[in-house]
Amino acid sequence: MSAVLFKRLVFQVGDSANERTFTLSSVSKNGHFISLRPFTKPTEDEKKFPLEWVFAGTNDRVKVTPTTNADGKPVLQQDFDMGFDTNVYLNVENTHRGVINTFWQNWESGCVEETGKVFPFGNDKEGIPFMELWQPIDPNSKDLVILDAGDGRKIDGPVRSTVLKVVDGQDFEGLMIIVGEWAQGYLADKNKSSVDGLSFVRYHVSNEKLSSGLFEYGSQLSKFPTDFSNVKEGSLLTIDGLKWEVIEN
């Protein structure tokens, strides 16, 4: 598979559809993933933690199975067992825990529909269906350029796919994924379970370095890698005392 970048257009739970976030999901060539979902206009109560949700994981945390829906159309079943989930980290009440079964179907427009069901009150209780509509984005453009199946727009050139993971055995866990010119990452302090232990970044990458910051949150931003000019798969970086390993490049 090739690395992809998606922007969420619509989020629907039950009969209510809305979109309050600037959500981007990055998926590396090898299937590592992160979804960063900051609010565009957080309320006063939300400003302390201005994100709807963040989750991430390595490719061993998702199972992908081609299948068909009830109409016989091809869909992709993706079963996520999140390696990291802000709702679980923060111990948010009525949070789904465990695998989330999702189904992905391509629309003629080029958009991708994701449907599924979560069980925030327990697997033995009634589930809540949801739908998310995703727009593929050109990861090689620093502008938000859509990939439209209607006009046949193609990505210009190969797509960079670099993934760095915090080395086990430290006080933090974290993942950073670069797809094309877009970088997203998270850090979580294992010794905390509050918003004070979380840090997130979304950046453009230019000339092998993080350039313009699109979103930043948290007190540990200095621990994120910023220079990728000499990274090779398997190499180790130490950033402000934190060790990262390049697990894909």
Curated annotation (Swiss-Prot):
Pfam families: HRI1. Coiled coil: none annotated. The keyword Cytoplasm applies. It is found in: Cytoplasm; Nucleus. Its main location: cytoplasm. GO terms for cellular component: endoplasmic reticulum membrane; fungal biofilm matrix; nucleus. Gene3D superfamilies: Protein HRI1, C-terminal domain (2.40.128.310), Protein HRI1, N-terminal domain (2.40.128.320). The keyword Coiled coil does not apply. CDD domains: HRI1_C_like, HRI1_N_like. Keywords: Cytoplasm, Nucleus. GO terms for biological process: protein targeting to membrane. Belongs to the HRI1 family. This is Protein HRI1. It comes from Candida glabrata (strain ATCC 2001 / BCRC 20586 / JCM 3761 / NBRC 0622 / NRRL Y-65 / CBS 138) (Yeast). The lineage of its organism: Eukaryota, Fungi, Dikarya, Ascomycota, Saccharomycotina. The gene is HRI1.
